[in-house]
């Protein structure tokens, strides 16, 4: 376990070095660190902006740069899977999260570009875009409110997200994809 702020290059460097020391290679990265701030756009502060960019973007960039360099040296390809958000593609009225979505949406756009840039080296970039997941983060919303967030009327589990990550990590011919795990919320209004 590494203690540190993933938005700092030094932390990413420690993670990378430990992975290589412990496993001998880096074959897959799951960039799961992220924060989500819900408030009206005009209420975001400079501190909110810095925190969102540091964790959601810099946290992805630093660890991914180091992992890609290692994968290139290994010449065996690899997989980078990031966690974004279904709200990027289908915002929900009453859940103002524009600054969070700017960082997550930027991450999705960057993944597609990286998938193209590193395809010839068989380094794949994909994302899982969860909707509402049954975690303590959503425990105060109430079961009925949460179930209305998807047309299936269900809530994703941590296992649902993990299964999607495993699929994208192992699917050798899949790159540049955003896999929505949101009970159909990304398909639009229902």
Question: Could you describe each region identified by the protein language model?
Answer:
Residues 25-27, 71-86, 120-123, 177:
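Active-site loop of short-chain dehydrogenase/reductase
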Residues 64-65, 112:
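A short, exposed helix-loop element centered on a Lys and neighboring polar residues
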Residues 40-41, 48-53, 146:
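Substrate-binding pocket helix/loop in short-chain dehydrogenase/reductase
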Residues 32-37, 184:
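Conserved NAD(P)H cofactor-binding loop of Rossmann-fold oxidoreductase domains
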Residues 123, 158-181, 186:
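C-terminal substrate-recognition "lid" of short-chain dehydrogenase/reductases
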